[in-house]
A protein has these predicted regions:
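A solvent-exposed, acidic/Ser-Thr-rich amphipathic alpha-helical stretch
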Residues: 28-96
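Short, low-complexity N-terminal intrinsically disordered segments enriched in polar/charged residues
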Residues: 1-37
Length: 99
């Protein structure tokens, strides 16, 4: 692995970390910054229908949902990166606590 690949991996992990940090700090600008304008989300396991969403509506709905919690903690571990040319995937374990 060369230096450029290590930088790519770090930048990809930074996006995953910003996801958790944005939610936990209620930093909605940070949270919005990690998304492209149109997303494909799947949170069926918690009752949110899978499908396409606009990033703005996703963030707006998250903001509404998280207003009901006093605190949250999202922890992301075991980042596994697959990088091919200009396409990358990061699979990680996310543990979320909502209080």
């Amino acid at each position: 692995m060369n230096a450029a690949e290590l930088v790519d991996r770090a930048e990809i992990s930074d996006v995953v970390i910003a996801y958790a940090t944005g939610l936990d700090r209620r930093d909605w600008s940070l949270y919005r910054s990690i998304f492209v304008d149109e997303l494909e989300m799947d949170f069926v396991s918690v009752g949110i229908p899978a499908g396409p969403y606009s990033a703005d509506s996703w963030v707006r709905d998250a903001r509404r949902l998280f207003a009901g919690f006093e605190a949250t903690q999202h922890t992301s571990t075991n980042h596994v990166h697959t990088i091919r040319s200009d396409t990358a995937t990061c699979v990680s374990n996310m543990q979320a606590e909502h209080f």
